[in-house]
Amino acid sequence: MPFVNAAGLGEYDVIVVGSGAAGGQTAYTLAMEGARVLMIEAGRRYSPESETPMFHTPDQAPLRGTSTPEKPFGFHDATIDGGWQVPGEPYVNVSDDDAGRFEWWRARMLGGRTNHWGRYSFRNGPYDFKPKRRDGLGFDWPLGYEELAPYYDKVEMLIGVYGANDGLENTPDSSPGCLLPPPKPRVSDLLVQDRARRLGIPVVAGHRAVLTQALDHRKLPRKLHPGNASAQAIIAGHMQRRAACFWATPCGRGCSVGANYQSTTVHLPPALATGKLDILVSAMVHEVFLDREGRASGVRFVDKTTGTNGEARARAVCLAASACETVRILLNSKSARRPDGLANSSGKLGRYLMDTVGTSVQGQIPLLEDLPPHNEDGASGGHMYAPWWLYGEQLRGKLGFARGYHIEFQGGRTMPSMRTVSGLEWLTSGSYGRKFKEDARRYYGSMVNFDGRGEMIPNEHSRCEIDPAVKDRWGIPVLRFHWQWSEHETQQAAHMQKTFAAIIEAMGGRVRGEVIADGARAIAPGGSIIHEVGGAIMGDDPQSSVTNGYGQAWDVPNLFVTDGATFPSNADKNPTLTIMALAWRSADHILERMRRREL
């Protein structure tokens, strides 16, 4: 069962819409356990092995690889046919005010955003699953950390995550054998760690989905698929084909040796090897249709290659197209009996959209000037980070905002780009020629960037709906967004700015630009961190949620949502690892229901 076209579809147990972290994990789990799966992807086929510019330097790219409207993260970024604006696929914002706008990032390619993402892989902690119980705000999840912990273990072992167990509050340790050794800290990391700890801020090894050593292909397959010899053999062979990272290139380009997690190198190859997975690319799903009993029969799509309409049928449907795209499909799956869309008897579909709170500060550190030339390429992203450390003060109401953030930071002498040189202008005072070269050598590697990533509390004002007038190039109605930050988020962003400046000062450095005291100005626009979740939240009550704790729609028993749309809260931990853990758990539930002939 390989890549297929719209005319060659067979009979399937499950249709999975989407091929990124959620779709990849869902399809992998189902196929490895014997279910017949059709994956449908809106973008084109993509191969990291042949399309990743692993060893290209910036001078080999147009404009030395700098950002363009078509490539917002630079020419060498892995994203194809994607970005905040996709030609022919508009979306609408109700507000013209920057504070009320939502920027929607999409990647129209096999593997979706997993080809591009930062690979930060944090577990939600016990507080994160029951936030309302702690402070009375937002929603609790219909499951706790203990229920998801075994799936966090499995995902970490499968994809490969480096990190360490530090025993910190609400920052769960992994089970023995799950984590790979973290990479060696850079000089700037050690300096940040030393000075931040003087301020009471813990700095520990980061957790990222990058192989610092080869996976144990002898032990891990038995833990991942107990009692399934066929699956064990397939994944053992696949693990042997993934090489450890040798620090060749930024992870955002993708990886031709499989050293970081992309669904295109980790989930899809072994799932295809089972013979149970078909993949249909360039097919835009726009509707889930039902049978006379109100059960999902399949999906309708536009074949983007031919422009024709098509259908696919299965015993169950899993939507994993990314939070907003999944909501769009459900809202467009309306009928005379369901004028407000499918799975929307609660009226909550499209509501409680969330992103991560973000803001940044850069500092120049004289202690890091004029260091001897040395290689600090490493795992491209941060080797260390600072988890949230003020739970007690926050619970006592001393901070002015209810939820926390973590700090990602990076410095060091990594491969320079156009941004490296242009970023020195505030220090070089217009120097030119030999003097500029001397300045570049002096200041190169002395910059440290601090990025805050914080929790947004769901609110009634942040939501999406179908625009009544605008359609995309395929004739599919598009989303219209409403967005609003609360004071919890803006005060949090202001706290980030103040904290980053304090760390830079403790390092003996100077801040580039101003420290923004007004959190409403400091906070990044909604959607720009590309961590949007919610819109089809899970819960215990069908009157106030769209799905149960397995992502199973209350209204349609064989319809599942396995992406971030089900999140009822958005912790400061980047959501991808939790998305995959939930998807694995949901897929296990689907398999069990099928064994009992309930689907």
Question: Which stretches of residues belong to each language-model region?
Answer:
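FAD cofactor-binding and catalytic pocket of flavoenzymes
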Residues: P87-R106, L110-R113, W117, W141-Y145, ...
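A short, basic/flexible loop-to-alpha-helix module at the beginning of a structural domain
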Residues: M1-E11
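A glycine-rich dinucleotide-binding beta-alpha-beta segment and adjacent secondary-structure elements
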Residues: G206, L220-N228, H286-F289, Y443-M456, ...
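Conserved N-terminal glycine-rich FAD pyrophosphate-binding loop of Rossmann-like flavoproteins
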Residues: R44-E70, R108-H116
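Conserved redox-cofactor binding core of oxidoreductases
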Residues: L63-G65, E70-V86, N93-A99, R108, ...
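N-terminal Rossmann-like FAD-binding beta1-loop-alpha1 element of flavoenzymes
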Residues: V14-M39
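A conserved short coil-to-beta-strand element within the FAD-binding core of flavoproteins
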Residues: R208-A209, V281-R295
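Glycine-rich loop(s) and the adjacent beta-strand/alpha-helix scaffold that form part
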Residues: M32, R36-Q60, V257-V266, A273-T274, ...
